Swiss-Prot record:
SMART domains xrefs: LH2
The reaction(s) this protein catalyses: (9Z,12Z)-octadecadienoate + O2 = (9S)-hydroperoxy-(10E,12Z)-octadecadienoate
EC number of the protein: 1.13.11.58
Record note on quaternary structure: Monomer.
MF terms (GO), sorted A to Z: linoleate 9S-lipoxygenase activity; metal ion binding; oxidoreductase activity, acting on single donors with incorporation of molecular oxygen, incorporation of two atoms of oxygen
Feature: compositional bias, Basic residues: 234-243
Name used for this protein in its record: Seed linoleate 9S-lipoxygenase-3
Originating gene: LOX1.3
Length: 857
């Protein structure tokens, strides 16, 4: 409970920290015809000076936590106004301003628990915190706010903030109960009307805003979510009007509504990063297209050296196009034009030691364990591999790879022995793409469903043994697949064919990675948790305080993705093989999504990459001991789970207290039945009846938002910045003997490879986007950190959190030591690129390391 009684007429000194809107404002992007934006607009706003806050434009009223009025609500103090500017305060962050305030409070009003704030100005500001000092018998009271405050006339009820106490609903001081309930009611809204910029309402909707049917049938996209054909997690509701041609689709606009406090309220270089993403998709993309239309630059790369030239000389572009790109700070940083008429990219890590090591079989295989998509490979349990596609519709899709293909390279084992010894592995890109392959190949892209079988060698590395490329059967789907099997070769035209076979595999892997491993399994699945948490858990609820840092900026980046990246004609559709079917195909994969399998140990066991073994440190034994993502990930997973367990057990003294928590039960019920409503009847959902269920659920949410996202996101440019290594689409089939393409492959294998994979224009767009996505913002908050040290007043929770941070620091040292162990060949590989993606800390920029708390880019 806060403090002791205050003496009658006692003055309480306070400090209010806020940020002016003009400090945080990023100009909207102007039309393509003009200069793209102006960066941060640091001057010329309505709030020219801090003195605008002095006088009576902002009022605060303290609320008692122990003394109630006639309605049973905490007593209100007198309205008080900001008094003076504090010019020096050591704890002030960038762009923050501090003001003095003095409240009158008497002992008849009891102990402080909350405050109201009103803004009478026309312009909103960002309230960071209120700190009350020298409270008798207590010291300081902290209110962590981090919220936009708009003009009071825009709201039916006053804005309220609670002190940093933590209460289960049953433990809330009686005078605060109604305030707590009212605030949650305000955040839920009534589910009607179009949401306005200043609102903080959290609600659900289906993904019905990716297409633009009013532009024509070709621009329509199916509704994802709310139907059995395309189930999907829910997104935040905006309430925009339906399109004219399709009442089930929502009209698009240049700004996507977000609950106001989900938009950036911090001076973050990711303001620039996300602004850069928007600029690339809306402005740079058409500008580059015009350069290609004018034939200013050849449409194809001519050689691998020309691709490497992107990082030295760059791509020459017309002066007027450069002049439109370079004024924007983020793009100046991304493209490094250096005053030259060229776009230049930083050299990706994968070629910093060797320009050709990416071509080796060992590196191709190693990236399945330590690359940007390290959680798809599985242990082969049956041979030949079979399909789960409905044979009534698609016929027989059993693999055509035979034992004779594999056994010459099994180090003396038979296939059966290799399977028994868990030494054969499969990277399967067959079932997700096959039902769409006819449609994909009817466009300018040409691709295969692929299966890759690999063998675990005695030295602990993986060796690819065979790649199967499959097409829909010419005689119709029910006839099964038409398949070819390719084997490794290291010289002659066969080696060029083998390199192409690997490229078709990587194209599928790139698409699956971007749309499923990255977008669906982190960004999209987390959004319903954010919505449910904010609708049902009060800010003083212990689980809200646990999870809230792991939601930072996620709805914002997801809204931007719907606007510019995964929409009709967006960056993903333009640069990835799946094209217009991209997000639709991820919905088909979501049918197999299981929440409880998102826990790393469960995922590894499901893929056959680990076996339950209580004698091992994490309760499981890895099938491949040197599996960098799994080895490092298990350390992080355990640290998260230990921290969550300690924290949950501080507040729930028994399973009964959890079952009787109305906020938690309502939150979980709605998450299952609405947020992931297309999965509501699945038997695997935790019933949320025990503390252990809550621990596991919270650990999965935190793991997904932090470490899993880091593992699949921040390696995108280090690995994929070389399009040769991670092509995103393929444009022609494997050349057949006797054809002109085969002859070209024999005479000029590099040119044939480049004519097959992502062309130059799409490469430039892809690199521009993944370079931004792979960067850390300057004020990123990493796992084990909080953006405010006063996030809770509970010293027990603070001590447990400190132990968590210390554990992560120890893990970081251990991971770095592993990278120096030459016996662990999969950690660095032929490209000599140590696996650092799960090192918790990082500096700003393109670092190939660091685990942010949340999906913030």
């Amino acid at each position: 409970m806060l403090g002791g009684l205050l003496h009658r007429g006692h003055k309480i000194k306070g400090t209010v920290v806020l940020m002016r809107k003009n400090v945080l404002h990023v100009n909207s992007v102007t039309s393509v015809g003009g200069i793209i934006g102006q960066g941060l607009d640091l001057v010329g706003s309505t709030l020219d000076t801090l003195t605008a806050f002095l006088g009576r434009p902002v009022s605060l009223q303290l609320i008692s936590a122990t003394k109630a009025d006639a309605n049973g609500k905490g007593k209100l103090g007198k309205a008080t106004f900001l008094e003076g500017i504090i010019t020096s305060l050591p704890t002030l962050g960038a762009g923050q301003s501090a003001f003095k305030i003095n409240f009158e409070w008497d002992d008849g009003s009891g102990i402080l628990g909350a405050f109201y704030i009103k803004n009478f100005m026309q312009t909103e500001f960002f309230l960071v915190s209120l700190t009350l000092e020298d409270i008798p018998n207590h010291g300081s009271i902290h209110f962590v706010c981090n919220s936009w405050i708009y003009n009071a006339k825009l709201f039916k009820s006053d804005r309220i903030f609670f002190a940093n106490q933590t209460y289960l609903p049953s433990e809330t001081p009686a005078p605060l109960v109604k305030y707590r309930e009212e605030e949650l009611h305000n955040l839920r809204g009534d589910g009607t009307g179009e949401r306005k910029e200043w609102e903080r309402v959290y609600d659900y909707d289906v993904y019905n805003d990716l297409g633009d049917p009013d532009k024509g049938e070709n621009h329509a996209r199916p509704v994802l979510g709310g139907n059995d054909t395309f189930p999907y997690p829910r997104r935040g509701r905006t309430g925009r009007k339906p399109t004219r041609k399709d009442p089930n689709s929502e009209s698009r606009s240049n700004d996507v509504y977000l609950p106001r406090d989900e938009a950036f309220g911090h001076l973050k270089s990711s303001d620039f990063l996300t602004y850069g993403l928007k600029s690339v998709s809306q402005n740079v993309l058409p500008l580059l297209q015009s350069a290609f239309d004018l034939n200013f630059t050849p449409r194809e790369f001519d050689s691998f050296d020309e691709v490497h030239g992107l990082y030295s000389g760059g791509i020459k572009l017309p002066t007027d196009i450069i002049s439109k790109i370079s004024p924007l700070p983020v793009l100046k940083e991304i493209f490094r034009t250096d005053g030259e008429q060229a776009l230049k990219f930083p050299p990706p890590k994968v070629i910093q030691v060797s320009k050709s090591a990416w071509m080796t079989d060992e590196e191709f295989a190693r990236e399945m364990l330590a690359g940007v998509n390290p959680n798809l490979i599985r242990c082969l349990k049956e041979f030949p591999p079979r399909s789960k596609l409905d044979s009534q519709v698609y016929g027989d899709h059993t693999s055509q790879i035979t034992k004779e293909h594999l056994e010459p390279n099994l180090e003396g084992l038979t296939v059966d022995e290799a399977i028994q010894n868990k030494r054969l592995f499969l990277l399967g890109h067959h079932d997700p793409i096959m039902p769409y392959l006819r449609r994909i190949n009817a466009t300018s892209t040409k691709a295969y469903a692929t299966r890759t079988i690999l063998f675990l060698k005695n030295d602990g590395t993986l060796r690819p043994l065979a790649i199967e490329l499959s097409l829909p059967h010419p005689q119709g789907d029910q006839s099964g697949a038409f398949s070819q099997v390719f084997l490794p070769a290291d010289e002659g035209v066969e080696s060029s064919i083998w390199l192409l076979a690997k490229a078709y595999v990587v194209v599928n892997d790139s698409c699956y990675h971007q749309l499923v491993s990255h977008w669906l399994n982190t960004h999209a699945v987390v959004e319903p948790f954010i919505i449910a948490t904010n609708r049902h858990l009060s800010v003083v609820h212990p689980i809200y305080k646990l999870l809230h840092p792991h939601y930072r900026d996620t709805m914002n980046i997801n809204g931007l993705a719907r606007l510019s990246l995964v929409n009709d004609g967006g960056v993903i559709e333009q640069t990835f093989l799946w094209g217009r079917y991209s997000v639709e195909m991820s919905a088909v994969v979501y049918k197999d999504w299981v929440f409880t399998d998102q826990a790393l140990p469960a995922d590894l066991i499901k893929r056959g990459m680990a076996i339950e073994d209580p004698s091992c440190p994490h309760g499981i034994r890895l099938v491949i001991e040197d599996y960098p993502y799994a080895v490092d990930g298990l350390e992080i997973w355990d640290a998260i789970k230990t921290w969550v367990h300690e924290y949950v057990f501080l507040y729930y003294k028994s399973d009964d207290t959890l079952r009787e928590d109305p906020e938690l039960q309502a939150c979980w019920k709605e998450l299952v039945e609405v947020g992931h409503g297309d999965k509501k009847n699945e038997p695997w959902w935790p019933k949320m009846q025990t503390r252990e269920e809550l621990v596991e659920a919270c650990a999965i949410i935190i793991w997904t938002a932090s470490a899993l996202h880091a593992a699949v996101n921040f390696g995108q440019y280090p690995y994929g910045g070389l399009i040769l290594n991670r092509p995103t689409l393929s444009r022609r089939f494997m050349p057949e003997k006797g054809s002109a393409e085969y002859e070209e492959l024999r005479k000029n294998p590099q040119k044939a490879y480049l004519k097959t994979i992502t062309p130059k224009f799409q490469t430039l767009i892809d690199l521009s986007v993944i370079e931004i996505l792979s960067r850390h913002a300057s004020d990123e908050v990493y796992l084990g950190e909080r953006d405010n040290p006063n996030w809770t007043s509970d010293t027990r929770a603070l001590e447990a959190f400190k132990r968590f941070g210390n554990k992560l620091a120890q893990i970081e040292n251990k991971l770095s030591e592993r990278n120096n162990d030459e016996k662990l060949r999969n950690r660095c590989g032929p490209v000599q690129m140590p696996y650092t993606l799960l090192l918790p800390s990082s500096k700003e920029g393109l670092t190939f390391r660091g685990i942010p708390n949340s999906i913030s880019i």
